[in-house]
Amino acid sequence: MFGIKYHRLDKEAPLQMHWGFFRKKLSLFEGVAFIISGTIGAGILGLPYAVSKVGPLLGVLFIVILGLLMMGLNLMLGEVLVRTKDHLQIVGLSHKYLGIFGRVFMTTMMYSSMIGILVVYIIGEGQALASLFGRTPLEWSLLFLAVAAVFIFRGLKTFKIFDFFLTVGVLMVVSIITFACVPYIKMANLAFSSFKDFLFPYGVVLFAFASSGAVVEAHGILKDSEVNFKKAIIIAGSICILVYATFALAVLGVTGLETTEIATIGLASKVGSSFFVIGNLFAALAMGTSFLVGGLAFKHSLCWDYKVPRQVSAAIVCLVPLVIF
């Protein structure tokens, strides 16, 4: 995979994305940042609780093994993207290679999950920002959606300017939380294991690594370099595995069996209220970037896979979650 020269089906015709969103080639680091921002979201805050159900050793094994499997899945998806001349998202790829059944199945599954996730992020963003700055969650949710709508309507050409810095901000906040936990870690909290809820972490960890939509978008960003595309997938996947495992162990070392479903709530009770503020800051950043990446992937799927006009696609992405919200 990626290690040999491919002869494109369009006889090496240069790949041009629709509507000029990708006129400039972005660097490898920006491609990595885009995949990370589409992977690390609010799901990371639930990882320590999931790990606490089975113990640190089994929990980290879940994170590493599922992380590597998802990285392999993304590399296989990358192989398909490299060999496909059409500009397609997951739904379109399913139609092209699996027929009408694949299209119907993936449309139902992907679009329903995308809409649900966007609604959850709108609600969560409102709660996080209200905790940080006051006023009501409803006001912040609507304000967030209004700002996000600007990026979704304008497309990735505008969002890519901010994405790298937002991703750096997310990683910095996670690092601050992790290192701040170190003085409070008790080894006794890391010396247990349980098989009672052996499969409990599976869904949580798998959700935390979901990033197929971001990988498809990254292919457009790194269209001129198949080598950098492969590197971006591997580097981003490795960073996510390292961040998830380190964060889960650090939190578990502090809160042990008292780990809460949202990690920062338990940390605030053990270490101090400052963790509650930092946790809300992280949640706001992570959910914001994930919402934008997911929204752009949804928009591009409507455009590329169903040929819906660009502005209509953006309106659907913004208005449908708003109506449900």
What residues fall within each predicted segment?
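Helix-loop-helix junctions that connect adjacent transmembrane segments
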Residues: 9-23, 134-143, 155-269
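Helix-loop-helix connectors at the membrane interface of multi-pass transporters/channels
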Residues: 3, 92-96, 122-141, 221-225, ...
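Transmembrane alpha-helical segments of multi-pass small-molecule transport proteins
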Residues: 32-39, 107-111, 123, 131-155, ...
